[in-house]
From Swiss-Prot:
It comes from Chlamydia abortus (strain DSM 27085 / S26/3). Keywords: Ribonucleoprotein, Ribosomal protein. GO terms for cellular component: ribonucleoprotein complex; ribosome. Belongs to the bacterial ribosomal protein bL36 family. SUPFAM superfamilies: Ribosomal protein L36. The keyword Cytoplasm does not apply. Residues 1-20 are annotated as: Disordered. InterPro entries: Ribosomal_bL36, Ribosomal_bL36_sp. This is Large ribosomal subunit protein bL36. It comes from the Bacteria. One of its GO terms (biological process) is translation. One of its GO terms (molecular function) is structural constituent of ribosome.
Length: 45
C-alpha cells in the first residue's frame, strides 16, 4: 500500500475513495496494486 500526503482516485480504473477510522483510503478490487492511504497524524491508542 502506498502512503502519501495527497492521494488521487481514478474511477475509470476502478478506484474508490473510502474513509475508515478518520483516514482516507483508495481501494481497487480490479487492480489491488493501486491501493493508497493518505498520511496523517499518528493514531492514538
Amino acid at each position: 500500500m502506498k502512503v502519501s500526503s495527497s492521494i488521487k482516485a481514478d474511477p475509470s480504473k476502478g478506484d474508490k475513495l473510502v474513509r475508515r477510522k478518520g483516514r482516507l483510503y483508495v481501494i481497487n478490487k480490479i487492480d489491488p496494486n493501486r491501493k493508497q492511504r493518505q498520511a496523517g497524524p499518528a493514531r492514538k491508542k
